[in-house]
């Protein structure tokens, strides 16, 4: 057994938890064993002992030098994350200061852009940007590039005095797509027969508050009528609620039928022998009322309704 075998004994199979810790030592042991085999093959048996002794005397010095290296003096910082992950930090120092120094040095250097990278057909100017002598810190970057907490200014609302002044400009009315022209399309006027104003809000059809000055702008095109305006009860005074011509000169309600005689049959409508369909076929029919109340067109008294229910079979037959 040589001195190497005494100093560096062969270990068993590495365990899974200690494999990373003993890997360098196993590599060193394999390297030394190969060196010893090469010396034994090349040297004579008499000189093999002196060679091995000289090699063994040099080995502890090299190991001490490796142990005294700065890497051994500064072990990595281990941070336990979970049962399967451990974070080792080999960097020593303040990370934030190193990162700031790196970026400040990179921004102070000239740009790496070269005009030779572009095609020869592209026009080239003699400005500092093309000359690659313009540092990045002096370029016109937006404020959000240098300050991450920068907030853009909020634009003024549409109902503010700035928006009102913008609508009063001479070119505002000439543009058909300007907010003033669009607002004028929606507020054309109350002279049209289908235009009506809702009493519960001042601007019935415009969802945006663009200010009072925008409503005064004129528009060359009429706005389309909404569905609820076409079918509104105030569609046209010439038509009734059922879009039928209004009948003039007729009573709003049917006259109450007189009470029958005590000896008359229950199905008799009146003492004069009035036919059953006279109340429906007359000018005061239920579907000719000009007013918006349908119940007025069906002006039947309680007695007439009771008679119709009693003799409904004879009337419908």
From Swiss-Prot:
Summarize subunit and interaction data from the UniProt record for this chain: Interacts with TEFs. Binds to TEAD1/TEF1.
State any GO BP term from the record.
Answer: positive regulation of transcription by RNA polymerase II
Q: What is its main location?
A: nucleus
Species name: Homo sapiens (Human)
Judging by the UniProt lineage, the source's domain of life is Eukaryota
Q: Which GO terms describe its molecular function?
A: transcription coactivator activity
> Which family does the record claim for this protein?
Belongs to the vestigial family.
Which stretches are tagged as biased composition: Low complexity? 44-57, 108-120, 272-292
> What name is this protein filed under?
Transcription cofactor vestigial-like protein 2
Keyword annotations: Nucleus, Transcription, Transcription regulation
Cellular component terms (Gene Ontology):
cytoplasm; nucleus
Protein's job: May act as a specific coactivator for the mammalian TEFs. May play a role in the development of skeletal muscles.
Comp. bias intervals (Basic residues): 196-206
């Amino acid at each position: 057994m040589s001195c190497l075998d005494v100093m560096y004994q062969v270990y068993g199979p590495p365990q899974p938890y200690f494999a990373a810790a003993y890997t360098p030592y196993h590599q060193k042991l394999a390297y030394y064993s190969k060196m010893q085999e090469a010396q034994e093959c090349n040297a004579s048996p008499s000189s093999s002992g002196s060679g091995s002794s000289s090699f063994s005397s040099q080995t502890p010095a090299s190991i001490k030098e490796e142990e005294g290296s700065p890497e051994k003096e500064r072990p990595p910082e281990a941070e336990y994350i979970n049962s399967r992950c451990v974070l080792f930090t080999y960097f020593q120092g303040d990370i934030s200061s190193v990162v700031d120094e790196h970026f400040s040095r990179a921004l102070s250097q000239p740009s790496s852009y070269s005009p030779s990278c572009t095609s020869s057909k592209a026009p080239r100017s003699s400005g500092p940007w093309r000359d690659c002598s313009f540092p990045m810190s002096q370029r016109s970057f937006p404020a959000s590039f240098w300050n991450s907490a920068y907030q853009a200014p909020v634009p003024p609302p549409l109902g503010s005095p700035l928006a009102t002044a913008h609508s009063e400009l001479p070119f505002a009315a000439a543009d058909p797509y300007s907010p003033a022209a669009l607002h004028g399309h929606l507020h054309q006027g109350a002279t049209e027969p289908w235009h009506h104003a809702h009493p519960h809000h001042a601007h019935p059809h415009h969802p945006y508050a663009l200010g009072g000055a925008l409503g005064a702008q004129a528009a060359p095109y009429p706005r389309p009528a909404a569905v609820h305006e076409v079918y509104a009860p105030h569609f046209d005074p010439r038509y009734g609620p059922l879009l039928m011509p209004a009948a003039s000169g007729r009573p709003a309600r049917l006259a109450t039928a007189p009470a029958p005689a005590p000896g008359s049959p229950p199905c008799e409508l009146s003492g004069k022998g009035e036919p059953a369909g006279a109340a429906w076929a007359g000018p005061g029919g239920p579907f000719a009322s000009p007013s918006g109340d349908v119940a007025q067109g069906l002006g039947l008294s309680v007695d007439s309704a009771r008679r119709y229910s009693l003799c409904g079979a004879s009337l419908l037959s």
